[in-house]
A protein has these predicted regions:
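Canonical Radical SAM [4Fe-4S] cluster-binding loop centered on the CxxxCxxC motif
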Residues: 40-80
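Catalytic cores of alpha/beta
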Residues: 140-147, 203-217, 279-290
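Conserved strand-turn element in the central/C-terminal portion of the radical SAM core barrel
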Residues: 103-106, 130-135, 183-209, 227-235, ...
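Core AdoMet radical
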Residues: 67-82, 88-110, 115-184, 193-200, ...
Length: 345
């Protein structure tokens, strides 16, 4: 397949995803990088990642912190989380992401509300204050409104698969595709920059499924997307089922390809170079940036807790060295929220 033959409809996207030709993949990534620079610029925006808790009420079949898995649970105190946010401010990251297992208990909800207000009050020495993205799963509309009013302005809720049948294969029966979709539309309606994403190269997934994921992002009009390669956790039901999935090399290539295709499909959105890329390649996130991504999320969670937030069998625990990226030519957007151009239209 040649780049000149690429079309951005379902058939063309699926053909590009299925194509394993190295020359095509290289040309695609180079074109996506060119489009990125021309539309959103060369700047890389930083989101300091705070993994606030690995306690989760959900039981997703692929996840290493699912409710029924045996692991050492933790929850950062408000003081620990706030201290970590101050580290982000000191490093001029511009924004933080508060990510954790899904919980809907009142104590946790109130804690996040208090934490948001405290983070927004941090004196960064710059204007604006720290931006805050939340990634805390499905909540009621009322909770989303409470957190928005407390200072969160971006929310990442991954659909994981836009195919309802595939969604049901990787989630227990008490998980609802329709409920997740409604949560996304609630977030958008409230005023969040509502981001989503899916796993890439998981069991049962076809090239057409991945093409549909890309088209789902466009139909939803997502201002930001965080997607990454499927990385199996050895103790999850999906891994233990023995269902086949692509090799690590192929999943990595697919991850870069999906970033590149999405950049061509939605030129002015924010696209994250996911941590999952770096699990498969030491330079994974850098290669993601060169494929069209423009956001990275250095992990600033205290290390003694970071090791417990084991979504998958990850080989890397350290945050991306931002200075190292700079030394190799990346332009870092220090002190900036880096909101999606698409959202600001």
């Amino acid at each position: 397949m040649k780049l000149s033959e690429l079309t951005l409809d379902r058939e063309g996207l699926a053909a590009a995803i299925a194509c394993g030709d190295a020359a095509f993949e290289t040309a695609l990534r180079e074109e996506a990088y060119r489009v990125k620079v021309a539309t959103v610029g060369a700047e890389v925006y930083l989101r300091g990642l705070i993994e606030i808790s690995n306690i989760c009420a959900k039981n997703c079949l692929y996840c290493g912190i699912r409710r029924d898995i045996r692991c050492q649970r933790y929850e950062l105190s408000e003081e620990e989380a706030l201290a970590t946010a101050r580290i982000a401010a000191k490093r001029r990251f511009g924004s933080v992401v508060i990510q954790g297992g899904e919980r809907t208990d009142a104590a946790f909800i109130r804690k996040i509300t208090r934490l948001l207000k405290a983070i927004k009050a941090i004196d960064t020495g710059e204007d604006p204050p720290l931006g805050v993205t939340l990634s805390l799963g499905e909540q009621s509309r009322e909770v989303y409104e409470e957190w928005f009013d407390a200072g969160a302005h971006r929310y990442l809720l991954r659909i994981e698969s836009s195919n309802p049948d595939l969604y049901r294969k990787i989630h227990p029966a008490d998980h609802s595709y329709d409920r997740r979709l409604q949560a996304l539309y609630d977030l958008k309606d409230i005023g969040y920059q509502a981001g989503t994403g899916a796993m890439i190269g998981m069991p049962f997934q076809t090239a057409e499924d991945m093409a549909d994921d890309l088209l789902f992002y466009k139909k939803f009009d997502a201002p930001m997307v965080g997607m990454g390669p499927y990385n199996p956790h050895p103790e999850t039901p999906l891994t233990l089922s023995g269902a086949p999935y692509p090799s690590a090399e192929r999943r990595f290539a697919l991850g870069l390809k999906m970033i590149a295709l999405l950049r061509l499909l939605m030129p002015d959105i924010n696209i994250a170079a996911a941590t999952a890329l770096e699990v498969l390649d030491p330079l994974g996130r850098e290669k993601g940036l060169l494929s069209g991504a423009n956001v990275i999320m250095p992990n600033i969670t205290p290390e003694e807790q970071m090791v417990k937030y084991n979504l998958y069998d990850r080989k890397t625990l350290n945050a991306t060295d931002v200075q190292d990226l700079e030394s190799r030519g990346a332009v870092i957007g220090y002190g900036r929220w880096g909101d999606s151009k698409h959202f600001r239209k």
